[in-house]
């Protein structure tokens, strides 16, 4: 299972079963922070507690399979190379924070990677459930299945007044972080994204880049997530975030039509230039690749550029990341110039199909 996860550009859950109309929403994610009752939190770095949590996680494979019918595997991070761990971060299957802490850290992963449980990160467990497109409710329902299967065998640290107890006070309560990853090229291109982000933050939500906190919104890809976990139910959190995202989708569509109406030829020029560069360039760095791939996806959505596969944008975003690229090519000793050359070649091959 590990080889499949590391070698495949897209996890099975991220592939679209039906034709997406405008590829604005890339994916939905639910994350539940949980700690076991009676054990010191991970940030205390208590070896005995870390060992116990690790042992509990290794015994979860059969109960989880019974809960949702998927096969589960346990992946010890200590047994992975640095580049393999970096690929898991690039694929959003592991947090950068977990990559930095190795002893007693592991992942419990479903066969389609729609469920990933990070063990001994900031909390004992971070249960992550993912789905393609805007499917927060589906992702949440799956997370609850897993959550209940674990809690049925190993009680969580829970307080009647405060809710689920977590290492960081900002997660206390529901322990729920719901997030949606969106591709917003027209809002970015028009400059309207700055004002929109300000409005979203004022409503109590966070806006981050492709790789979460502190990351840049490369390729016009943004993550929108809730911040409040106390005084609000899980259902209300999901309902409110869904409404926020639906509003963002409407604004992106409006911006696309505005760009077409105000200067269609200018827009076509930008999109065709990006297409031309990636069709013929011999070296492309990661940032330029994402920027121009974003332009091409917008051009495909607006029927300005030739159509490409329904998952091509997501595949190329994954393949052109530096760590996955070296894994994809089977060579971890590539120079930066080598990476830029191979990145350009991979993109040219995709565009020629």
Model-predicted segments: where are they?
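Long, Pro/Ser/Thr-rich low-complexity/intrinsically disordered regulatory tracts in eukaryotic proteins
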Residues: 1-161, 176, 190, 195-197, ...
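Conserved phosphate/anionic-ligand binding catalytic regions in large, soluble enzymes, centered on
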Residues: 163-180
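Alpha-helical support elements that line or immediately flank enzyme active sites
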Residues: 180-186
């Amino acid at each position: 299972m590990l080889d499949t996860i590391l070698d495949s550009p897209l996890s099975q859950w991220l592939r679209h079963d039906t034709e997406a109309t405008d590829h604005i929403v890339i994916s939905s994610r639910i994350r539940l922070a949980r700690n076991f009752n009676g054990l010191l939190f991970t940030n205390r770095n208590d070896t005995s507690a870390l060992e116990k949590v690790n042992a509990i996680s290794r015994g979860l494979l059969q109960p989880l399979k019974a809960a949702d019918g998927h096969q589960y595997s346990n992946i010890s991070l200590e047994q992975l190379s640095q580049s393999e761990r970096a690929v898991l971060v690039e694929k959003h299957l592991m947090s950068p924070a977990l990559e930095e802490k190795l002893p007693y850290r592991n992942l419990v992963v479903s066969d389609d990677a729609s469920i990933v449980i990070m063990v001994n990160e900031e909390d004992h467990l971070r249960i992550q459930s993912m789905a393609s497109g805007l499917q927060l409710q589906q992702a949440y329902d799956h997370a609850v299945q897993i959550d209940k299967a674990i809690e049925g065998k190993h009680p969580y640290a829970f307080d009647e007044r405060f809710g689920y107890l977590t290492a960081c006070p900002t997660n206390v309560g529901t322990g729920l972080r719901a997030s949606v990853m969106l591709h917003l090229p027209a809002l970015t291109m028009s400059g309207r994204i700055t004002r929109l982000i300000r409005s979203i933050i004022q409503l109590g939500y966070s806006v981050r880049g492709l790789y979460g906190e502190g990351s840049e919104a490369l390729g016009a890809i943004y993550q929108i997530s809730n911040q409040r976990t106390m005084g609000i139910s899980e259902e209300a959190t999901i309902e409110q975030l869904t409404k926020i995202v639906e509003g963002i989708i409407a604004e992106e569509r409006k911006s696309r039509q505005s760009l077409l109406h105000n200067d269609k030829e200018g827009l076509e020029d930008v999109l065709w230039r990006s297409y031309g560069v990636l069709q013929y360039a011999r070296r492309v760095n990661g940032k330029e690749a994402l920027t121009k791939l974003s332009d091409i996806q917008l051009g495909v959505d607006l029927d300005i550029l030739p159509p490409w596969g329904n998952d091509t944008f997501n595949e190329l975003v994954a393949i052109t990341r530096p760590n996955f690229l070296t894994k994809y090519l089977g060579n971890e000793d590539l120079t930066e110039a080598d990476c830029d050359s191979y990145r350009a070649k991979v993109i040219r091959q995709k565009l020629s199909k």
